[in-house]
């Protein structure tokens, strides 16, 4: 996937992506760096859905292969801890689908 960082375009292996966030732009996070994409979040979702990515909220997509643990949070949300220790909150709108995708009751 082509992403921008420091004025350069980088071709990044999607396996390295931890999560993607849309806050005033679309940002892609890896363990080593943050990149920017010209694509909107829904476009990233369409590209990555078949590669193990999951829509966690209106603002974020996470790589299910990088999930270390899950914890129930208030209002039926789920707090996901990634392999690097960062935490992403899965909104209740997407929480049931996350449980289904991971085979959790």
How would you label these PLM feature ranges?
Residues 1-83, 87-89:
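Conserved binding/recognition cores within well-folded domains
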Residues 100-105:
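Short, charged, intrinsically disordered terminal tails
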């Amino acid at each position: 996937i082509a992403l921008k960082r420091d004025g350069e375009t980088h071709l990044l292996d999607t396996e390295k992506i931890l999560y993607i966030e849309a806050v005033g732009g679309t940002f892609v996070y890896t363990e080593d760096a943050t990149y920017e994409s010209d694509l909107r979040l829904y476009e990233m979702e369409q590209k990555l859905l078949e590669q193990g990515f999951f829509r966690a909220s209106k603002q974020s997509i996470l790589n299910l292969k990088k999930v270390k643990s899950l914890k129930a949070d208030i209002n039926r949300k789920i707090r996901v801890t990634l392999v690097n220790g960062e935490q992403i909150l899965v909104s209740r709108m997407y929480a049931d689908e996350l449980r289904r995708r991971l085979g959790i009751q």
